[in-house]
């Protein structure tokens, strides 16, 4: 009997701790005004019996999921809210705050601003479909574990951050992981064939893996037996010949991968280099290479985490530097800046080389208009 009593005590202790934890969590929700409750509603929760707190709170919930989740993490893990923030290295150029705390939320574009920009820049911007009618899709491909290369520790944070960002921008996000180059190509063709693109106004393709100059590494890659998805394959799959559903619509490609082994930094003098001879070409020497009535490759923009031949850096506890700053800049500026301006904000945050240097680069830009995302519209 004494043994049975001894065995039951830990269960009772756990039950008691669980009730106290949940009660404290609910009180934190109310105290920090996460749910924006009226005073009368707050009083009901404070005064409710322990077993009734959850029911009373559910009856009063508002649309504050993200803040509520952060309060939950802070209460559950008993950590300071600043301990989970992702911060730029101290020596980087003053740029966007990279905290993922309560301030790191997607700023929405006021409807009046949306209407104003659409009117003032009509003909200069890509048209945005009505939210109720559009079916935006986004694809994230991320390889973390490899057969012959080290794991990409911290990549899970990149997936989570990009998925939340794209969903906030109105995209239904498909995530694919652990893919060989052949698997990646198969996923791309299937995604390009999705019917939803017909009623969409754009798409995002996000690739996160090890990489080389010409492509993205699959899970079986090695120097002896390369397993690489060429960048050309991505553009070919979604061009106007193979993906008519996205014709004349922005196709945004985000790449977090090394593009070589160089460190991307160099000691230089203040003396300007000699100017190279300018390149000129007479129009009489130009010939057409295609007879299509529409451009084969148009409305693309690729944003890579580094310049060619250079590495990209990833914090194993916080995620990739590029993805972290990309998300921050979207959250801060997508409401008022077009896509190329947002990308420039990201580049500016890397402008001053730190201990680990890299410079994100825009490539194969064939967008003929400005692409505003107008979050919230």
Curated annotation (Swiss-Prot):
Site positions (Cleavage): 289-290
Molecular-function GO terms, alphabetical: cysteine-type endopeptidase activity; lipid binding; lipopolysaccharide binding
Entry's transmembrane regions: none
Active site per the UniProt annotation: 210, 258
Catalytic class of the enzyme: hydrolase
Primary localisation category: cytoplasm
Modification after translation: In response to activation signals, undergoes autoproteolytic cleavage and activation.
Keywords annotated in UniProt: Cytoplasm, Endoplasmic reticulum, Hydrolase, Immunity, Inflammasome, Inflammatory response, Innate immunity, Membrane, Mitochondrion, Necrosis, Phosphoprotein, Protease, Secreted, Thiol protease, Zymogen
Function: Inflammatory caspase that acts as the effector of the non-canonical inflammasome by mediating lipopolysaccharide (LPS)-induced pyroptosis. Also indirectly activates the NLRP3 and NLRP6 inflammasomes. Acts as a thiol protease that cleaves a tetrapeptide after an Asp residue at position P1: catalyzes cleavage of CGAS, GSDMD and IL18. Effector of the non-canonical inflammasome independently of NLRP3 inflammasome and CASP1: the non-canonical inflammasome promotes pyroptosis through GSDMD cleavage without involving secretion of cytokine IL1B.
GO cellular component: canonical inflammasome complex; endoplasmic reticulum membrane; extracellular region; mitochondrion
Provenance organism: Bos taurus
Positions of the CARD domain: 1-91
Binding partners and assembly: Heterotetramer that consists of two anti-parallel arranged heterodimers, each one formed by a 20 kDa (Caspase-4 subunit p20) and a 10 kDa (Caspase-4 subunit p10) subunit. Upon direct LPS-binding, forms large homooligomers, resulting in its activation. These oligomers are often referred to as 'non-canonical inflammasomes'. In its precursor form, interacts with TMEM214; this interaction is required for association with the endoplasmic reticulum membrane. Interacts with CASP1. Interacts with NOD2. Interacts with Serpinb1a, Serpinb1b and Serpinb1c; these interactions regulate CASP4 activity.
Regulation of its function: Activated by homooligomerization induced by direct binding to cytosolic LPS, in a TLR4-independent manner. In addition to LPS, CASP4/CASP11 may also be activated by oxidized phospholipid 1-palmitoyl-2-arachidonoyl- sn-glycero-3-phosphorylcholine, an oxidized phospholipid (oxPAPC), in dendritic cells, promoting adaptive immunity. The role of oxPAPC is however unclear and another report suggests that oxPAPC competes with LPS-binding and inhibits the non-canonical inflammasome in macrophages.
SUPFAM superfamilies assigned: Caspase-like, DEATH domain
Membrane topology, record value: Peripheral membrane protein
Keyword hit for Protease: yes
PROSITE patterns: CARD (PS50209), CASPASE_CYS (PS01122), CASPASE_HIS (PS01121), CASPASE_P10 (PS50207), CASPASE_P20 (PS50208)
Family to which the UniProt record says this protein belongs: Belongs to the peptidase C14A family.
Modification sites for Phosphoserine: 83
Region of interest (Required for LPS-binding), ranges: 1-59
EC number: 3.4.22.57
Name of this protein: Caspase-4
InterPro entries: CARD, Caspase-like_dom_sf, Caspase_cys_AS, Caspase_his_AS, DEATH-like_dom_sf, Pept_C14, Pept_C14_caspase, Pept_C14_p10
């Amino acid at each position: 009997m004494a043994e049975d009593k001894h065995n039951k005590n830990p269960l009772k202790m756990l039950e008691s701790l669980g009730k106290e934890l949940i009660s404290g969590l609910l009180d934190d929700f109310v105290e920090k005004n996460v749910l924006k409750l009226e005073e009368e509603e707050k009083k009901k929760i404070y005064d409710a019996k322990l077993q009734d707190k959850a029911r009373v709170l559910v009856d009063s919930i508002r649309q504050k999921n993200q803040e509520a989740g952060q309060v939950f993490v802070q209460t559950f893990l008993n950590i300071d809210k600043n301990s989970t923030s992702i911060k730029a290295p101290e020596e980087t150029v003053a740029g966007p705050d990279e905290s993922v705390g309560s301030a790191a939320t997607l700023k929405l574009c006021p409807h009046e601003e949306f209407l104003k920009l659409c009117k003032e820049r009509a003909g200069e911007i890509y048209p945005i479909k009505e939210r109720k009618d559009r079916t935006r899709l986004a694809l994230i491909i991320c390889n973390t574990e490899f057969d012959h290369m080290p794991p990409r520790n911290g990549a899970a944070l990149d997936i989570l951050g990009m998925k939340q960002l794209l969903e906030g921008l109105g995209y239904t996000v498909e995530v694919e992981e652990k893919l060989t180059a052949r698997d990646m190509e198969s996923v791309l063709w299937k995604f390009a064939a999705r019917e939803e693109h017909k009623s969409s106004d754009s798409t995002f393709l996000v690739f996160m893996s090890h990489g080389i100059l010409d492509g993205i590494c699959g899970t079986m890659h090695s120097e002896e037996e390369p397993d690489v998805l060429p960048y050309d394959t991505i553009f070919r799959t979604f061009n106007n010949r193979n993906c008519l559903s996205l014709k004349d619509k922005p196709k945004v490609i985000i790449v977090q991968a090394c593009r070589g082994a160089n460190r991307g930094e160099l000691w230089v003098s203040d003396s300007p280099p000699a100017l190279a001879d300018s390149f000129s070409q007479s129009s009489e020497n130009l010939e057409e290479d295609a007879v299509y009535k529409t451009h084969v490759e148009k409305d693309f923009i690729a944003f890579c985490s580094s310049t060619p031949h250079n590495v990209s850096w990833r914090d194993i506890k916080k995620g990739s530097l590029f993805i972290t700053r990309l998300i921050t800049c979207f959250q801060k500026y997508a409401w008022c800046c077009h896509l190329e301006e947002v990308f420039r904000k990201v580049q500016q945050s890397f402008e001053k080389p730190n201990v680990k240097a890299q410079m994100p680069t825009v490539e194969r830009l064939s967008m003929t208009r400005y692409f505003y995302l107008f979050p919230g519209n």
